[in-house]
Amino acid sequence: MNVVVVDNYDSFTYNLVEYLSAQPRDDHAPDVTVLKNTASLAAVRAADPDAVVISPGPGHPDTPRDVGVTTDVLRAVSPRVPTLGVCLGMEAAVHEYGGTVGRAAEPMHGKTTPVSHDETGIFADIQQDFPAARYHSLVCTSIPSCFAVTATTRDGSLPMAIRHRDHPLACVQFHPESVLTGVGHDVIGNFLDAAAAH
């Protein structure tokens, strides 16, 4: 399986690479290619990905230099190639498909929050109210109708994950690749299982 990670210049990117590489399918670890968000869409396509992961990163999704090729990938690749957006990856997807992203009332950096979810897709066989690591000062304030909200903070006040209704695109606001997220390997594994079955 070929996995492309679009790196939005985040310190967690290589944690994602490690988590992906630790998930063999058919006795083979995924081949992971990391492309900076300054890469071209042609470079992403040339890597012939079976799956794409859009990394976290600093900045705002409405600032082109902060997300680079991410927006092109979301529009041109994600409709057919299974894609997982993480943190900025989720914010970029919401923004690109017509939602809004704003400042959080309280920035969350290195804190955990219990997450409730729909027990499907990337959350299949994952415990309810698992602790999820959060490192973000932005939140998705309106979710486009093309997405289903699949996870929230326990009180339901903030979306923590979404899934596109028609495309193989799932996104999480939290960081599955952080050691503070106890089920991170399982979330990544469920994503890779879905990608392999696509």
Curated annotation (Swiss-Prot):
The keyword Nucleus does not apply. Its EC number is 4.1.3.27. Residues 2-198 form the Glutamine amidotransferase type-1 domain. GO terms for molecular function: anthranilate synthase activity. L-glutamine binds at G57, P58, G59, S137, L138. It comes from the Archaea. Keywords: Amino-acid biosynthesis, Aromatic amino acid biosynthesis, Glutamine amidotransferase, Lyase, Tryptophan biosynthesis. It catalyses: chorismate + L-glutamine = anthranilate + pyruvate + L-glutamate + H(+). InterPro entries: Anth_synth/Amidotransfase, AS_beta_subunit, Class_I_gatase-like, GATASE, TrpG/PapA_dom. The active site is at C87, H175, E177. GO terms for biological process: L-tryptophan biosynthetic process. Pfam families: GATase. Pathway: Amino-acid biosynthesis; L-tryptophan biosynthesis; L-tryptophan from chorismate: step 1/5. The keyword Nucleotide-binding does not apply. Heterotetramer consisting of two non-identical subunits: a beta subunit (TrpG) and a large alpha subunit (TrpE). PANTHER family: MULTIFUNCTIONAL TRYPTOPHAN BIOSYNTHESIS PROTEIN, MULTIFUNCTIONAL TRYPTOPHAN BIOSYNTHESIS PROTEIN-RELATED. Part of a heterotetrameric complex that catalyzes the two-step biosynthesis of anthranilate, an intermediate in the biosynthesis of L-tryptophan. In the first step, the glutamine-binding beta subunit (TrpG) of anthranilate synthase (AS) provides the glutamine amidotransferase activity which generates ammonia as a substrate that, along with chorismate, is used in the second step, catalyzed by the large alpha subunit of AS (TrpE) to produce anthranilate. In the absence of TrpG, TrpE can synthesize anthranilate directly from chorismate and high concentrations of ammonia. This is Anthranilate synthase component 2. It comes from Halobacterium salinarum (strain ATCC 700922 / JCM 11081 / NRC-1).
